[in-house]
């Protein structure tokens, strides 16, 4: 949103600041009052808007671009967003250490791509294994970045764990790069679940669960398991009270390898989120540990 605001100001656009985006009714009133051309947000915000019947009554003819950042957009959200607004969701990636942005999809994109786009000019990105070896096209590892907009060190701490030997920042994101140079992010390295030696990316499991029409939103974490090291636990917010564990398990078993399927499912009234709407998995891990 910050980068979109700067871009908007640079071309003379009027900015409308929604001070409480969690007030979906109030948010929709603002969108109805002011024709909007660009709408940036996080996936959970778009999910909440889509669940409100009044959102579908808005006039989207002026809107030219919707951008998701901060967390991955789920395919189901992108699909429903296109059906309601007629617009694709475009994703980008960045962090504070890259001045907010490091990759972006072309603004003239017409379809949801499932990736976060291409490195910006003067930015170099590669994918590395745990020994800092650069991986081949489409291989999965940690995304590392270097460029004019990327920090070169942290102040007053040992930087060896945060940078490669040749000066690339380790982002902590598990990713791959395709033949065209587009980056696909699978998950945060710290959120990856290891079940009997196999890697499970929470985003992949969440994408499947959110395909169920009775699911409002969900989040997946790893919990300690004496036999497997870790097992998968899903926290699910219902969109329909008739939803049950068997519904979730059947969907996952149909679409995921057995080790990726949640062994534990807990229904919850709402997911813990940051002030900008990002789901806080560390709080869910703490909740699971205390259970």
Per-region residue spans from a language model:
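Beta-strand->loop->alpha-helix junctions that form or flank phosphate-binding loops
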Residues: 90-97, 117-119, 221-224, 266
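Acidic/polar alpha-helix N-cap and adjacent early helical turns
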Residues: 287-291
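Active-site glycine-centered loops adjacent to acidic/histidine catalytic or metal-binding residues
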Residues: 70, 94, 117, 173, ...
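Conserved AMP-binding/adenylation subdomain of ANL enzymes
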Residues: 1-38, 52
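AMP-binding/adenylate-forming catalytic core of the ANL superfamily
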Residues: 32, 39, 147, 152-153, ...
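Gly/Ser/Thr-rich phosphate-binding loop
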Residues: 10-13, 36-41, 50-111, 124, ...
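Glycine-centered tight turns that cap/initiate beta-strands
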Residues: 54, 62, 86, 122, ...
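Conserved ATP/PPi-binding loop(s) of AMP-dependent carboxylate-activating enzymes
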Residues: 118-122, 133-162, 200
């Amino acid at each position: 949103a910050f980068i979109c605001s700067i871009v908007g100001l640079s071309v003379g656009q009027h900015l409308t600041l929604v001070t409480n985006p969690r007030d979906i009714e109030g948010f929709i009133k603002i969108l109805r009052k002011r024709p909007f051309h660009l709408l940036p947000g996080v996936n959970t915000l778009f999910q909440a808007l889509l669940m409100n019947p009044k959102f579908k009554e808005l006039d989207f003819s002026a809107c030219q671009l919707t951008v998701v950042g901060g967390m991955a957009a789920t395919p189901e959200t992108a699909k429903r967003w296109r059906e309601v607004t007629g617009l694709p969701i475009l994703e980008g990636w960045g962090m504070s250490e890259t001045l907010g942005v490091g990759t972006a999809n072309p603004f003239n994109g017409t379809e949801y791509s499932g990736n976060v786009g291409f490195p910006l000019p003067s930015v170099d990105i590669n994918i590395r294994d745990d020994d800092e070896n650069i991986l081949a096209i489409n291989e999965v590892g940690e995304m590392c970045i270097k460029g004019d907009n990327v920090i070169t060190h942290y102040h007053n701490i040992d930087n060896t764990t945060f940078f490669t030997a040749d000066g690339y920042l380790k982002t902590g994101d598990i990713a791959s790069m395709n033949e065209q140079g587009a980056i696909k992010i699978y998950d945060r390295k710290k959120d990856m679940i290891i079940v009997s030696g196999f890697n499970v990316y929470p985003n992949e499991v969440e994408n499947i669960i959110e395909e169920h029409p009775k699911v409002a939103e969900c989040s997946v974490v790893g919990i300690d398991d004496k036999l497997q090291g870790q097992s998968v636990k899903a926290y699910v917010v219902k969109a329909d009270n008739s939803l049950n564990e068997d519904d979730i398990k059947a969907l996952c078993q149909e679409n995921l390898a057995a080790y990726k399927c949640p062994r534990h499912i807990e229904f919850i009234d709402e997911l813990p989120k940051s002030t900008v709407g990002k789901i806080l998995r560390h709080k869910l891990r703490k909740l699971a540990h205390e259970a």
